[in-house]
Every structure is written in C-alpha cells, then in structure tokens.
C-alpha cells in the first residue's frame, strides 16, 4: 500500500473512532462517586415507580377479600427473575463480588425493558400518571447504561455493553376487566416491585464498598 493511501486510511479510521474515544474519555473523567449517585437515583426512581404502580393497581382492580388468593396463585407467586441466581438475604448479598452484583442488576433491568413499555396501558385512566410508558422505558434504559458504565469502571475502565436477554417477562395485558388478565398483571407488578427492590439494594451495596463515605443507610 502506498504511503499516501496508508495515511489516508489511518486518518479516516481516526475520524470514525473519535466520537467513541471522546465519549470514553468523558466517562473516565467523571468521578466514580458521581456515576454511583446517578445510578442510585435512577434505581430509586425505578423502585418507587414499581411500588406506586403496584399499589395503584391493587387499589383499583383487586378486591380486598380476594387479595390473599391473588397473591398465592401460582401465576402471581413465581417471577422470571427466580431463574436468575440472586442473593436472597443480606448475608448472601455480602458474599457476592461487586461485579457479580452489578451483573445480576443488569440482568434484572434488561428483563423489564420490553414489558415496561406497556406498564401504564393496564389502567383505563392513563391520566393517573404524569409520565408515559416511554418515560418508564427510558428510565430503565438509562439505568442499564449506568450499570454498564460502572461495570467497565470497576473492571478495566472501559464501558461494558451487554446483550438484551432473549427471555424476558411477558407484556402487561390491557384487558383490565378479564380475570386472567388481572391475575397476570398483578403477578407482573409484584415481580417488578420485587426486582427493582433487589436492584436498588445491590447497587447500594456496591456503592458502599466502592465509594468512601457512602455507607450511610
């Protein structure tokens, strides 16, 4: 290859890589504590969203005298995330490494990326909320990217990108007057609340270990 052609090729390659290098450099200059603060904020918002939606659905559609039977139905008592090996108590959580906890959190978030697009469609009155399904999706997507960034920083400094799980939770059913649909949605919301609680707990543990002075919980 002629010297001029080689130079042109290298220049073109550098120009193509420049945006990625700039982004990677920008991430490296952000203090780890700030990355954790942002991830924890998003994790808390996701957990609160799950709590609020679960309570709203329960109050709107689940009769009080049927709540016990709904909760103990096999369709509502099993979560897809139960197939993902996760710590079940604080002692088990403490035995996991930071990267293990982040990987588990990432899997949990990715399992909800598609279902959360239909989260608010369950409610006949969508005016109950000020935000939309797309806002919920972008919240989880932002959290996913934040966890990937933290994994990269804790490993070797580069941002990690993972594959979306092929098997995830099913979509929420919009037929709010059908008993089977109510049962399905109630079970999904129970799992959503349970999983987001885990994500927030795991991230808090990793933050406590990684950032000095952040264990005040």
Curated annotation (Swiss-Prot):
Pfam families xrefs: Hormone_1 (PF00103)
The encoding gene: CSH1
Single annotated GO MF: growth factor activity
Protein name (database record): Chorionic somatomammotropin hormone 1
Protein keywords: Disulfide bond, Hormone, Metal-binding, Secreted, Signal, Zinc
Disulfide bridge map: 79-191, 208-215
Organism: Homo sapiens
Cross-referenced InterPro entries: 4_helix_cytokine-like_core, Somatotropin, Somatotropin/Prolactin, Somatotropin_CS
Binding site for Zn(2+): 44, 200
Residues of the signal peptide: 1-26
GO biological process assignments: animal organ development; growth hormone receptor signaling pathway; positive regulation of receptor signaling pathway via JAK-STAT; response to nutrient levels
Subunit (UniProt): Can be found in a monomeric as well as dimeric form.
Function summary: Produced only during pregnancy and is involved in stimulating lactation, fetal growth and metabolism. Does not interact with GHR but only activates PRLR through zinc-induced dimerization.
Cellular localisation: Secreted
PANTHER family: CHORIONIC SOMATOMAMMOTROPIN HORMONE 1-RELATED (PTHR11417:SF67), SOMATOTROPIN,PROLACTIN (PTHR11417)
Source taxon at top rank: Eukaryota
Further details from the record: CSH1 sequence only differs from CSH2 sequence in 1 aa.
Family the UniProt entry places it in: Belongs to the somatotropin/prolactin family.
Transmembrane in keyword set: no
GO cellular component terms listed in the entry, alphabetical order: endoplasmic reticulum; endosome lumen; extracellular region; extracellular space; vesicle
Keyword set includes Transcription: no
């Amino acid at each position: 290859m002629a010297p001029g052609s080689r130079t042109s090729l290298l220049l073109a390659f550098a120009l193509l890589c420049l945006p990625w290098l700039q982004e990677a450099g920008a991430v490296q200059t952000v203090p780890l504590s700030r990355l954790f603060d942002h991830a924890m904020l998003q994790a808390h918002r996701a957990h609160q969203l799950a709590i609020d939606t679960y309570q709203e659905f329960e109050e709107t559609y689940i009769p009080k005298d049927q709540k016990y039977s709904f909760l103990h139905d096999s369709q509502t008592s099993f979560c897809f995330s139960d197939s993902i090996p996760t710590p079940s108590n604080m002692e088990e959580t403490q035995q996991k490494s930071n990267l293990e906890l982040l990987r588990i959190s990432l899997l949990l978030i990715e399992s909800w990326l598609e279902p959360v697009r239909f989260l608010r469609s369950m409610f006949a009155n969508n005016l109950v909320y000020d935000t939309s399904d797309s806002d919920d999706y972008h919240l989880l997507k932002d959290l996913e990217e934040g966890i990937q960034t933290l994994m990269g920083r804790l490993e070797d400094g580069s941002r990690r990108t993972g594959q979306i799980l092929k098997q995830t939770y099913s979509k929420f059913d919009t037929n709010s007057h059908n008993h089977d649909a109510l049962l399905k949605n109630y079970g999904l919301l129970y799992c959503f609340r349970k999983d987001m609680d885990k994500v927030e707990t795991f991230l808090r543990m990793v933050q406590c270990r990684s950032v000095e002075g952040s264990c005040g919980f």
